[in-house]
Swiss-Prot record:
Role played: Has a role in spermatogenesis and oogenesis.
PROSITE patterns reported in the protein's UniProt record: EGF_1, EGF_2, EGF_3, LDLRB
Lineage: Eukaryota, Metazoa, Ecdysozoa, Arthropoda, Hexapoda
Protein name per UniProt: Protein cueball
Entry's Gene Ontology cellular component terms: plasma membrane
Length: 643
């Protein structure tokens, strides 16, 4: 018996749903008149269902249990039905959720996954009903809001599951409004009642905390409006014509709506095209005087974005829903995290099995738990994986940041969406756009700035100029040179002179060469000429002489002076006969015969400078003597001849 257990476990594991066969394979669902059409993210049809119905209209989606709820206006017994998309089933069985009670006409559907309640508007009875899907289908629904006495006409409905609010549109053309109320029926508030005509479908964007609704304007025009959840900061997302939109759906970055006229689904970016009106109501925020304050702001148009036709349908398009990844995206949201935990806890409780488990059942449970990868939670009753932030896929096997950023680093945002931080020189949602891509023309080289704020610049090749090297100087100059041939007085840019000369060599009949006055002045002079070199050398020499003079003067200024010695000698002009015994004391010469010699400091003393006679002996012995020896002998002879 034990031999069959592993085999049975292996067979059961092989029969588990594969990753490509789970309900996560579709991203959009659209109700046509006689069927529901499922489409993927590229708007390719995957499958169709609910072919047994004849007049489908509104629909809503329970993403927690993968259930679609829709309305059929002509069914005899039921009014609202549920359908589960099963990729392995040959057909999709729709079950009755709400029994028909009369001649009702459902305008809009909404679902609350926390309390498991359905909300819908009845355009004939002018009421908003709700009912629990856990109650028997035969149990009559309850009235949440009765608008019959006011003459209002409720159309679209939407549930804010995080803040526990219900929003609806009133398309009564005499007094159209957008209103909200708590899901328990209290605190009704009008959030918009001006500058609207006939609001239709409405949806709450939990990611941006904003409302979006369709307004069927007068004539052939329509608009998609947006505001905060309290009605403030109203904006016109788009305005166009020749559409008859009914319902809309949202993704992270786009709006989708169904058009009955063109039988198609259209899309537009979610950002606003014009900021319209900001309204703050007293119920939300009171002013100082306690009255309603309304401020009009000037329209601020942004870049126009055309509408995109994403899907052509075979029948009249009506309701539409989109998969938003609610449980993954809002796990960290301040308003939604507690609601997500409560819903997940309820799903876990529903998945618990109370019967006695065998060995095979326990092993099957282990296989089911291992079915979801990367920490995903497996909901066995619905065969569904709830993935943690950063992972997606039917088994949470795909990391959202894997290969997401082309030239950058990927991180998960607070809303569990991948976000790219680009490298310098790259931009785009996935850093896929280079700032230099296609910037420089004609072979120019792109240079990035030193900082992220600096714009890239182009280094242009010869004969090209401009911020993007888009100006071809050869072509421009050729036009001037051709025109100069016929109009000689025209001014030709200076840079065209050489180009015109080159063009004239090949086509001298049509090309004229401009003649500029004082052309040599405009040319770049040669700096190192002979005159410049001479002036430079002379300047250096004079500079050196000046420095030498200054240094010598400083030395003479600070050098001490030598003492000046002055001595006077008296001698005869002519020697006497027999004068060997004469001395200056015994025989002093007379005044007429004497001669005085003054010697200063012994430095200006020389035989040639002596005004008296020159002894013969000195002439003979000092003929070839040096200056110093000459001075010594002169002093010696003078001492001998003193009187």
């Amino acid at each position: 018996m034990m031999i069959w257990v592993p085999a049975l476990i292996f067979l059961s594991a092989c029969l588990l749903p594969r990753s490509n066969g789970t309900p996560l394979e579709w991203d959009f669902a659209v109700t046509l008149r006689t069927k529901i059409q499922f489409l993927d993210s590229s708007w390719q049809t995957i499958a169709t269902a609910a072919h047994e119905f004849d007049e489908l209209s509104a629909l809503t989606f329970d993403e927690s249990e993968e259930l679609i709820y829709f309305n059929d206006r002509q069914h005899q017994n039921g009014s609202i039905f549920s359908l589960r998309r099963d990729a392995y089933a040959a057909s999709h069985v729709a079950q009755q959720a709400i029994q028909r009670t009369g001649n009702e006409s459902v305008g809009g559907l909404a679902y609350d996954p926390l309390n498991r309640n359905l909300f819908w508007s009845d355009t004939l009875q002018r009421k908003i009903f709700f009912a629990s899907i856990d109650s028997p289908p035969s149990q009559p629904p309850k009235v949440l809001v009765d608008l019959s006495q006011e003459g209002a006409r409720p159309e679209g409905v939407a549930v804010d599951i995080c803040r526990r609010k219900l929003y609806w549109t009133n398309s009564n053309i005499t007094h159209p409004t957008v209103e909200r109320i708590d899901v328990d029926g209290s605190n009704r508030v009008i959030i918009a009642d001006s500058d609207i005509d006939m609001p239709k479908g409405i949806v709450v964007d939990q990611l941006s905390d904003r409302l979006f609704w369709i307004d069927d304007l007068k004539g052939v025009f329509f608009a998609v409006m947006s505001s905060n959840l309290d009605g403030s900061d109203r904006q016109v997302v788009l305005k166009d014509k020749h559409h008859e939109p009914q319902n809309l759906a949202l993704t992270n970055d786009a709006i989708f709506w169904t058009d009955r006229t063109t039988k198609a689904v259209w899309s537009h970016p979610k950002r606003a095209a014009v900021k319209a009106t900001t309204t703050v109501r007293p119920e939300v925020e009171s002013s100082t005087d306690g009255t309603e304050s309304e401020s009009k702001q000037e329209s601020e148009p942004v870049e126009d974005c055309p509408l995109v036709r994403v899907a052509n349908l075979s029948e009249e398009a009506r309701g539409i829903v989109a998969r938003t990844g609610f449980y993954q995206r809002l796990q960290k949201d301040a308003h939604c995290s507690s609601i997500v935990r409560k819903i997940k806890l309820r799903l876990d409780e529903m998945s618990e099995k109370k019967e006695v488990r065998s060995l095979v059942d326990e092993r099957m449970d282990q296989l089911e738990r291992d079915h979801c990868m990367n920490g995903g939670s497996y909901i066995s009753k619905r065969d569904l994986c709830i993935c943690p932030a950063g992972f997606k896929g039917s088994r949470c096997e795909i990391r959202e940041c894997h290969n997401y950023c082309v030239h950058g680093t990927c991180q998960m945002s607070d809303l569990a969406y991948p976000k790219c931080y680009c490298q310098p020189g790259f931009t785009g949602e996935r850093c896929e756009v280079s700032n230099c891509a296609g910037l420089c023309l004609n072979g120019g080289h792109c240079r990035l700035g030193e900082t992220e704020k600096d714009q890239p610049s182009c280094e242009c090749p010869a004969n090209f100029a401009g911020e993007r090297c888009e100006q071809n100087s050869t072509q421009i100059c050729s036009l001037f040179c051709r025109l100069l041939k016929h109009e000689p007085e025209i001014h030709v840019p200076f840079g065209c002179h050489d180009i015109c000369e080159e063009l004239a060599l090949d086509n001298s009949t049509n090309i004229a060469i401009p003649q500029y006055q004082h052309l040599e002045v405009c040319q770049t002079p040669f700096v190192w000429t002979s005159s410049v070199i001479i002036i430079l050398v002379v300047g250096i020499v004079f500079s050196l002489l000046l420095i030498t003079t200054i240094i010598h003067g400083i030395r003479r200024l600070y050098k001490p002076k030598r003492p000046r010695i002055r001595k006077t000698f008296v001698v005869r002009k002519q020697p006497r006969t027999n004068s060997a015994g004469d001395t200056p004391l015994t025989n002093r010469p007379m005044t007429a015969e004497q001669c005085e010699i003054t010697i200063e400091n012994c430095c200006n003393m020389n035989i040639c400078e002596t005004p008296c006679f020159d002894p013969k002996l000195v002439e003979q012995t000092l003929a070839k003597s040096s200056c110093k020896e000459d001075k010594k002998i002169l002093i010696h002879n003078m001492e001998d001849d003193l009187y």
